[in-house]
């Protein structure tokens, strides 16, 4: 181990030592990186929460649209049945008219 005129730095050959100041600087640098990562994660967590809320709202909208489409389908089916009855009635009337004309 040798001293090279700097009280903040000592070296040992083939393996290194660091001063308390260097270690604290390294630790502070890592802490700052961790804080940035933590802030990024918090921000991303908030974005995910907002996306989940949007997804839930869109799911509710899809459910409402599905109900509307189902109701419209029922209405179309009812209208089809009504048209079928009207057609049958017209056919009966047409047959009666044909009978009257043939007499």
Curated annotation (Swiss-Prot):
Pfam families: DUF16 (PF01519). It comes from Mycoplasma pneumoniae (strain ATCC 29342 / M129 / Subtype 1) (Mycoplasmoides pneumoniae). InterPro entries: DUF16. It comes from the Bacteria. Belongs to the UPF0134 family. This is UPF0134 protein MPN_484. Gene3D superfamilies: 6.10.250.40.
């Amino acid at each position: 181990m040798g001293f090279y005129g700097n009280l903040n730095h000592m070296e040992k050959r083939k393996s290194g030592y660091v001063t308390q100041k260097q270690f604290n600087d390294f630790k502070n640098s890592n802490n700052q990186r961790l804080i940035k990562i933590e802030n990024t994660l918090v921000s991303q967590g908030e974005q995910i929460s907002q996306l989940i809320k949007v997804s839930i709202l869109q799911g509710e909208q899809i459910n409402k649209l599905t109900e509307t489409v189902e109701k419209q389908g029922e209405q179309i089916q009812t209208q089809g049945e009504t048209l079928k009855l009207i057609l049958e009635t017209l056919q009966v009337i047409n047959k009666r008219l044909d009978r009257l004309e043939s007499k």
